[in-house]
Design a protein with these regions (language model features):
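Flexible hinge/capping segments at coil-to-helix
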Residues: 1, 66-105, 191
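Central regulatory/effector-binding core of bacterial HTH transcription factors
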Residues: 2-67, 126, 133
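Hydrophobic residues within well-ordered alpha-helices
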Residues: 9, 50-51, 100, 141-147, ...
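A late-sequence structural motif
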Residues: 15-19, 165-197
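Ligand-binding cleft/hinge of the Venus flytrap
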Residues: 24-31, 97-98, 113-127
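A ligand-binding cleft/hinge motif common to bilobed small-molecule-binding domains
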Residues: 44, 61-68, 122, 136-164
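Secondary-structure junction motif
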Residues: 61, 103-123, 187-192
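Short beta-strand->loop
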Residues: 70-80, 131, 151-155, 162-176
Length: 197
């Protein structure tokens, strides 16, 4: 427990909420003198912070695109259909993408970080989205009020307080969340932290 220093982690809300707290708790039990800073951003910001040395580690749901970066898989996050509780899809065993494409779709995106549209494109479908936001809780509230349907990652839905139905998608698509870091100069504390993931 002689390790000191600070670990700066670039992350987004569902990882900060559902993945990191138990890891930090375990790490802190062994290394009480290490401090933490969590920076919240979108995926390209997070990767940029790690590349520039602003953050020691980052979490993004894809591979890093920059040079000199390494990644290790952290968790598989299934993508789920989110529909109003009174929707005909609410009781479906699995929801086909085609059924969602016919509804008013509320899209989770920020800048270029859109994991959902490619899902439809690969299936040869076009998604009709009149509403898009980066706030997953806003999406759940809108679905609850009958404004449309959406697809959200299971991690986000883990503590869903809204009156919506969450159903598996046909084919069970998922995203891979990775821990990313610079290969050249990852700090001792950050390297040790990676072992706790």
């Amino acid at each position: 427990g002689l390790m000191r220093g600070k670990i700066c982690i670039g992350t987004f809300s569902s990882v900060a909420t559902h993945v990191l707290p138990p890891v930090i708790a375990r790490f802190r039990a062994d290394h009480p003198d290490v401090d933490y800073e969590l920076l919240m951003g979108d995926y390209s910001e997070i990767e940029q912070w790690v590349a520039e040395g602003r953050c020691d580690l980052g979490f993004i749901p894809r591979e890093p695109r920059g040079a000199g970066m390494a990644s290790r898989p952290l968790v598989q996050d299934e993508l789920m259909a989110v529909v109003p509780a009174d929707s005909s899809l609410a009781t479906a065993e699995v929801v086909p993408l085609a059924d969602l494409a016919n509804e008013q779709f509320i899209l989770l995106e920020r800048g270029t970080d859109d994991e959902i549209t490619p899902l439809f494109r690969r299936a040869g479908l076009t998604v009709r989205s009149k509403l898009s936001t980066w706030d997953d809780y806003a999406i759940m509230a809108m679905v609850e009020d009958g404004l449309g349907v959406s697809i959200l990652p299971a991690l986000i839905l883990r503590r869903c307080q809204f009156d919506v139905a969450v159903r598996p998608l046909e084919g069970h698509p998922h995203r891979q969340i990775n821990a990313i870091y610079r290969t050249a100069d990852v700090s001792l504390a950050a390297a040790r932290f990676l072992e706790y993931l």
